[in-house]
Design a protein with these regions (language model features):
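Active-site glycine-rich loops that stabilize anionic/oxyanionic intermediates
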Residues: 34-39, 197
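Gly/Ala-rich beta-loop-alpha elbow adjacent to hydrolase catalytic centers
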Residues: 106-114
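Short beta-strand element of the alpha/beta-hydrolase
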Residues: 26-35
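Catalytic nucleophile-loop/oxyanion-hole region of alpha/beta-hydrolase
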Residues: 41, 67-99
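The alpha/beta-hydrolase serine catalytic core
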Residues: 112, 124-213, 217-221, 226-257
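Conserved alpha/beta-hydrolase
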Residues: 45, 49-71
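The serine-hydrolase catalytic nucleophile loop
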Residues: 37-49, 205
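N-terminal cap/lid segment of alpha/beta-hydrolase-fold proteins
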Residues: 1-24
Length: 257
């Protein structure tokens, strides 16, 4: 079963999409967190929700401000608003499924926001089973690459329009907010990192460095996979690894150290 709905919290308006198994009660809950310029309706989150639903998982996905169906404009795209959007949706999902394991599948920028919010997130929902697909550990640097400017040029223009699934602006203030949190640090949470061997956007070296400073992190490099995991067989491997982690917090493939 699939349906759309909206959540509200103070100034936030959050479009959401929920998938529940067609037969039987859900066994686990997944919060799906999209990447920068994406939405709750991206192919990755849709495929994940549909495939995991076969195994009894419910999935809740949402749009960040200025993404997807969000009525919030580009000025609402701040790091604080993204964190609060994540926490609000997580709280709703946890209240709906209070007795189920709480799992998170987050990609790119969504993984970055999840790491920013992780300590508060665990206060809201308790223990989290976390899968990060191609996490963007240097989001501020990535944003400079997307606007094709150095920091001084961006400061001078203050605002740049990006063409993604939806056209929106990014501001220099948003860039400065991203500078305040470097995700390449240590965390007290078991997690699985999935990264494409031939990712053309995010450096694999960051993933190895993250793994080395986080003892509870498992890293799997998907052979021949690009940033979008479009290589034949790559997405099937992502699904299998994600299911293994969410059900048993282990992976059958060996970890890369």
């Amino acid at each position: 079963m699939e349906r759309y709905f909206s959540l509200s919290q103070e100034t936030l308006r959050i479009p959401c999409r929920i998938f529940e198994p067609d037969f039987g009660a859900p066994k686990r809950c997944i919060l799906g967190v999209h990447g920068f310029g994406g939405s709750k309706d991206t192919e990755i989150l849709t495929n994940l929700s549909e495939e995991m639903g076969i195994f009894g998982f419910a999935s809740v996905c949402f749009d960040f401000p200025a993404h997807g169906d969000s009525v919030m404009d580009s000025d609402a795209l701040t790091l604080d608003n993204c964190v609060e959007t994540l926490l609000c949706t997580a709280r709703w999902a946890h209240n709906r499924y209070p007795d189920l394991d709480f799992c998170i599948f987050a990609s790119g920028f969504g993984a970055y926001v999840t790491l920013v919010a992780l300590e508060r997130l665990e206060e809201v929902v308790g223990k989290v089973k976390l899968v990060l697909q191609t996490p963007n550990l240097r989001m501020a640097d990535t944003l400079l690459g997307m606007v094709r400017m150095n920091e001084e040029q961006f400061r001078n223009v203050q605002r740049v329009t990006l063409n993604a699934e939806r056209k929106f602006d990014v501001t220099y203030d948003f860039y400065r907010q991203l500078r305040t949190f470097q995700a390449l640090t240590t965390y007290e949470c078991p997690m699985l990192l999935l990264h494409g061997e031939k990712d053309e956007i995010l450096p694999v070296e960051d993933m190895f460095n993250f793994r080395r400073i986080n003892d509870d992190c498992k890293l799997v490099i998907i052979p021949d996979a690009d940033h979008q995991f479009l290589t034949p067989g790559a997405w099937d491997m992502v699904l299998d690894l994600t299911r293994d982690w969410f059900e048993w917090e282990q992976v059958l493939l060996c970890d890369w150290s």
